[in-house]
A protein has these predicted regions:
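Membrane-embedded transmembrane-helix bundle of lipid-linked glycan/lipid transferases
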Residues: 1-169
Length: 169
């Protein structure tokens, strides 16, 4: 697909190529890839929720709700939106990264935010535009915390790195 982010098709193609050695069909390979993305998106939501609440039970419940949301189910099983299904892995990482930066934890901010944003852009660029607009509004609402030297410096560094890592696309 011309002008479409490459990560889903590339990763799915490599998985299919690998599983072809075990006589697994292309259709089954795509289903396995959907399962993997579904499972990892639940794990990422669990991580994000756990870092917010510090309670395993609430983190588990939120990841189950995240996986069972009608939008998530509709994207995978009704629309077969391949790239958007992969995006569900990266959205919790972006949110977690910003939360960690607001708390001054740069150790978690950089990997979460950068991996989340780069993965999001390379999986579904259009949805990441909407995510960026939403985060911009949230950051304007939280302007007292956001417009500080401790936030702006690392945030700009991370944004520049995201742009450099996704510049090829």
């Amino acid at each position: 697909r011309l002008f479409y982010p490459p990560i889903f098709h590339t990763a799915c193609a490599y998985l299919s190529y690998f599983l072809d050695n075990f006589n697994v069909s292309l259709t089954t390979s795509v289903k396995i890839f959907y399962f993997i993305t579904f499972f990892i998106s639940g794990c990422m939501m669990y991580l994000c929720s756990y870092r917010f609440t510090k309670k395993k039970s609430l983190a588990f419940i939120s990841s189950v709700i995240y996986l069972a949301s009608s939008y998530h189910i509709n994207e995978i099983y009704v629309r077969d939106a391949q790239a958007e299904s992969l995006l569900f892995i990266f959205l919790p990482l972006v949110i977690l990264g910003l939360k960690e930066l607001l708390e001054g934890n740069k150790k978690w901010f950089y990997p979460c935010f950068i991996i989340g944003y780069v993965g999001g852009i390379l999986s579904h660029f259009t949805m990441m535009i909407y995510v960026t607009l939403f985060l911009g509004i949230v950051m304007l609402i939280m302007y007292k915390k956001v417009f500080k030297k401790e936030f702006i410096g690392p945030f700009i560094k991370a944004c520049v790195l995201v742009l450099l890592l996704t510049a090829f696309f």
